[in-house]
């Protein structure tokens, strides 16, 4: 739960592509390393204003990632 909360805070300051990349990376890293990465990003982006164009919460990034996967599988088929 802590990971999702920190991810949401970081993602609101990123563009859509960067948020999806962090989402994918989140599934490849150990929990402790991911939390340290997200806290570092949150510190680095602390003065950047939130971008409100797209919702980039954990669940929306999951949806965007699934859409991207289905698009890529259709294109390669």
UniProtKB/Swiss-Prot annotation:
Sequence motif Nuclear localization signal, residues: 44-53
Keywords: Host nucleus, Virion
GO CC annotation, single: virion component
InterPro entries: FIV_OrfA
Organism domain of life: Viruses
Keyword Disulfide bond among record annotations: no
Compartments, as annotated in UniProt: Virion; Host nucleus
Intervals of motif Nuclear export signal: 34-42
Keyword Hydrolase: no
Pfam families in the cross-refs: OrfA
Primary location: virion
Function: Seems to function as a Vpr-like protein, since it mediates host cell cycle arrest in G2 phase. Cell cycle arrest creates a favorable environment for maximizing viral expression and production.
Full protein name: Probable Vpr-like protein
Organism whose genome encodes this protein: Feline immunodeficiency virus (strain San Diego) (FIV)
Organism ancestry: Viruses, Riboviria, Pararnavirae, Artverviricota, Revtraviricetes
